[in-house]
Amino acid sequence: MQQFFRPVIQDALRSAGIETGQPVQIEKPASAKFGHFSTNIAFLSAKELGKNPRTLAQELIGHLRFPSGSIEKTEVAGPGFINFFLTPPFIMDSLGEVLRQGEAFGRGTSGNGEKAIVEYVSANPTGPLTIGRGRGGVLGDCIANLFEAEGYSVTREYYFNDAGRQMQILGESVRFRYLERCGRKVDFPDTHYQGGYIGDIADRIYQEQGDSLADAEGTGEFKSTAEAIIFSSIKKTLERLGIRHDSFFNEHTLYTPDENGATRNSRVIDALRQKGFIDEYEGATWFLTTKLGQEKNKVLVKSTGEPSYRLPDIAYHLTKYDRGFGVIVNVFGADHIDEYPDVIEALKILGHDTSRIRIAINQFVTTTVDGETVKMSTRKGNADLLDDLIDDVGADATRLFFIMRSKDSHLNFDVDLARKQSKDNPVFYLQYAHARICSLLRMAWSENGFNPEKLPDLALLKTLSSPEELQLALALLDFPDMVRSALRLLEPQKMVDYMHSIAELYHRFYQECPILKAEADTANARLLLSLATRQVLQNGFRILGISAPESM
């Protein structure tokens, strides 16, 4: 409905000769007694125009030109708010758009085909995916879905961390376990990966190679084999959750020299040096962030010659600009909070428009089973694995639970709740609304001959006017605005909350408004309202990546 009100208000501002730099904001009042929608444009503009906000609001009302029959009344309230009351026939007539557009309802064009890249998961291939990584994966997948829904050309990317010290430790860990299989005595370091999967990889190498690698120098064979096996496992886990990627960017390409011997990493240092932001001391290469007002400079290359995380991250982001992405979205875990601002500062220094970059930081996850918290540690081998969680509660519950809290909030994943097959379980509650509608439609076909493929006259919707019907219809019409809002905030949780409200309103409508036992036209009208609800649920489920069961 935002798109219904905003142009009319903008036209009224022009007609009244009111020039304001304030955006036209449309809100839903907390109580229906204040109308269906409201705007605070008069309140926001009054000070800069030197006018009384209520007087300005009244003046603006005189220039509003809504379509005939759409507005029941318009009133000024409080310190200059303009409240709008829609007519029931207009609300119900507008609902026909849901059925006319079908799967396209809620899809926008604001992206206009602009290239957007969403990077998510990007876990080191040092072990199976943990539950903590799963949250970022689902969050990123939903954010990519939101961008696609608004008309962007989206690339979903996985930054494949196949370089650095952790990968070296992985290779060493597998080598130690392999040597044990060869009968060698090994003092396995506490700092290395100890999970059972390390032994499984060592077993595979031993079965294929015997003890031929026992005296081999280095860990190359062990690292490459482990990397391939683990990354294949990661992909399979992501597939189970419906998480997909279009491209995989290998970190090692940032270390690969060109024909002049320069790497992407070294070119970053050279470019920052030319800008006066690089110095070498204490055997390391430093990014002079004290010049930016920070207390300390940041290491880009350690005294060991190993780059810090900041350097390849800067180089990687430069490739996103080089590839022509107008919108760059990074979905990070909370462990990136301290690092990414330095990456942004470096990109600014190098002359790039960092307003094109959007960051979604998701906080940590803990899991509780039987009321007790499960601890996670990939290295210690007692990690709470994502595959185990999917086995336990299913893909739909796993996805929804990961995003039913704000990404900015710590998430406690209640496994006991996710297992429940009752309305207490949020995913069950949502899917039951869809299944209930499907069951109703089957009964309508069997008893009344109602065919969802051959709809009755949509004008029948205008005969509905009960509070339950109007509340549900208005909520359904909010769907496109909710998609845009969730995208603007990079917050799929907004969609979860909205979908829950739709399910709640439908259950209330179902209880209060007889459908199949009503008079024929009323029954058909309520079936149309049910169909519109099913369509919005399906469209929302598609964004959230959960299934829409027809029976439960």
Swiss-Prot record:
Keywords, comma-separated and alphabetical: Aminoacyl-tRNA synthetase, ATP-binding, Cytoplasm, Ligase, Nucleotide-binding, Protein biosynthesis
Sample GO molecular function, one term: arginine-tRNA ligase activity
Protein's gene: argS
Subunit structure: Monomer.
Name of the protein described by the UniProt record: Arginine--tRNA ligase
Primary enzyme class: ligase
Subcellular location per the Swiss-Prot or TrEMBL entry: Cytoplasm
Catalytic activity: tRNA(Arg) + L-arginine + ATP = L-arginyl-tRNA(Arg) + AMP + diphosphate
PANTHER family per UniProt: ARGININE--TRNA LIGASE, CYTOPLASMIC (PTHR11956:SF5), ARGINYL-TRNA SYNTHETASE (PTHR11956)
Pfam families per UniProt: Arg_tRNA_synt_N (PF03485), DALR_1 (PF05746), tRNA-synt_1d (PF00750)
UniProt xrefs under Gene3D superfamilies: Arginyl tRNA synthetase N-terminal domain (3.30.1360.70), HUPs (3.40.50.620), Isoleucyl-tRNA Synthetase, Domain 1 (1.10.730.10)
One record GO biological process: arginyl-tRNA aminoacylation
EC number: 6.1.1.19
Matches recorded under InterPro entries: Arg-tRNA-ligase (IPR001278), Arg-tRNA-synth_N (IPR005148), Arg-tRNA-synth_N_sf (IPR036695), ArgRS_core (IPR035684), DALR_anticod-bd (IPR008909), Rossmann-like_a/b/a_fold (IPR014729), tRNAsynth_Ia_anticodon-bd (IPR009080)
Motif 'HIGH' region: positions: 123-133
Lineage: Bacteria, Pseudomonadati, Chlorobiota, Chlorobiia, Chlorobiales
